[in-house]
Amino acid sequence: MPLPRAAFLLGLLLAAAAAESVRETETMDARWLDNVGSGDLPDDEDIGEFTPHLTSDEFDIDDTSGSGDYSDYDDAIYLTTVDTPAISDNYIPGDTERKMEGEKKNTMLDNEIIPDKASPVEANLSNKISMASTANSSIFERTEVLTALIAGGAVGLLFAVFLILLLVYRMKKKDEGSYDLGKKPIYKKAPTNEFYA
């Protein structure tokens, strides 16, 4: 019974994936479908049509290689001009002091951030130890290890206490059932009368 259910769920997932891919192809721009070779769509930055130099009369989809390469039009060069956006004078009022301080300090150099105050340089550089070896010498000095040990010890202690309580409870229950003296026996012993001759 589980195998048909799994097959049904797999089929349902495949149908949903196929429907989603069909939906994605329907959202393509219809004006690009005439001039696209091999699924090559223009970038968002492109200006104008995908192939402005080709008209529907000149372009035959059967003559192309499918790679988007148009061999008949390789020698033609088309230049497009891109309007550069005007640089706006964007500033925050009251932020001029910080801008002026930043220009004076010049803390950025070749994409590297230089601290404002230089760290003091010691005369003997050979005594410096790398940060990897300055880790705590003992594993028990690390806070993560101590936290894990304390939590593990608490859980282990609780487990041991519950185990002992369970054993004591079972022993008491067993003892109560076998040594109960207040119960009357199920059968009565027949009286033995001895007759002396």
UniProtKB/Swiss-Prot annotation:
The keyword Phosphoprotein does not apply. The chain crosses the membrane at residues 148-168. Its main location: membrane. It is found in: Membrane. O-glycosylated; contains both chondroitin sulfate and heparan sulfate. Ser-38, Ser-65 and Ser-67 can all be modified by either chondroitin sulfate or heparan sulfate, and the protein exists in forms that contain only chondroitin sulfate, only heparan sulfate and both chondroitin sulfate and heparan sulfate. Residues 169-197 are cytoplasmic. The keyword Glycoprotein applies. SMART domains: 4.1m (SM00294). Cell surface proteoglycan which regulates exosome biogenesis in concert with SDCBP and PDCD6IP. Belongs to the syndecan proteoglycan family. This is Syndecan-4. It comes from Gallus gallus (Chicken). The lineage of its organism: Eukaryota, Metazoa, Chordata, Craniata, Vertebrata.
